[in-house]
Structures are given as C-alpha cells and as structure tokens.
Amino acid sequence: MVDYFDYKELLKRARSQLPEVVFSDVRFEIPSADSFVEGNRTIIKNFKDIAKFMERDTHEFAKFVMKELGTAGDMEGNRLILQGKFGWRMVNEKIQNYVNEYVLCPECGKPDTKIIKEGRIHFLKCTACGAMKPLKSL
C-alpha cells in the first residue's frame, strides 16, 4: 500500500528538521571591536580581523573610522591606535556605520558586495542582486 502525504505536512516535517540558523535573516554579524583606553589613546586590538571579515581594505576602513571619530591614528600590526579616549560603544557604532554605508547592499541587505571604480567614481556593487550604488569618497 502506498502512503500518500499531504504537501503541507511534508513541508512542515522537513522544516522542523532544519536548524534555527537557516531561518535567521542575520548571517552577517561583525565581530565587536576589542578596544581599550591606554593613557590618552584608544587601541582596537582586532582591527585587521574586522576588516578582513568584511573583505575591505584596512587603510580605507581605518581612514573612515578616524574621520568619523575626528581624530588621528596609526596602524600597528593587527591594531589601530587612535589619539584620544573613545568608549567601546562609540567605536562599535562607527564600525556599524561603515558596514551600513560601505558593506551592506542597499537593495537586498546582503553583505556580498565589492567596491569597484568606474572613471573617478566608486560604486558598491552587490554580487547577489547586481545593484550598484555610488559611494561618497573618503
């Protein structure tokens, strides 16, 4: 005897066997900045790791963070050393601003983007949906 299942029952059964991560819309979570204040300087210990995770140029990323914080800084190995005292929350907020502006696609919201240059203008090109957005220069 052949056992026939209702399509909705099969779908429900299949979905129940999948992990919760599959249904989550968030697949791109930036590691938080491991920063601390030392004297009159703020040091972000895992700065290069964050840039590598986002697949962005470290120097352009550092330039953005320094401009947003209104300070000078220097790369030293894996760390970014900023002149001035900045709290952990403020540093992470500036990193999130960078992600929203230069990493996430404005159309589909996916992080599968690349920065390309056409003429004198930089564009954020999404490899997932094909959308292109002109970027502000740093």
Curated annotation (Swiss-Prot):
Keywords, alphabetical: Initiation factor, Protein biosynthesis
GO molecular function annotations of the record: translation initiation factor activity
InterPro entries tied to this protein: IF2/IF5 (IPR045196), TIF2_bsu_arc (IPR004458), Transl_init_fac_IF2/IF5_dom (IPR002735), Transl_init_fac_IF2/IF5_N (IPR016189), Transl_init_fac_IF2/IF5_Zn-bd (IPR016190)
Pfam families in UniProt: eIF-5_eIF-2B
Entry keyword annotation includes Transport: no
Subunit structure: Heterotrimer composed of an alpha, a beta and a gamma chain.
Family designation: Belongs to the eIF-2-beta/eIF-5 family.
Job description of the protein: eIF-2 functions in the early steps of protein synthesis by forming a ternary complex with GTP and initiator tRNA.
Name used for this protein in its record: Translation initiation factor 2 subunit beta
Protein's organism: Methanococcus vannielii (strain ATCC 35089 / DSM 1224 / JCM 13029 / OCM 148 / SB)
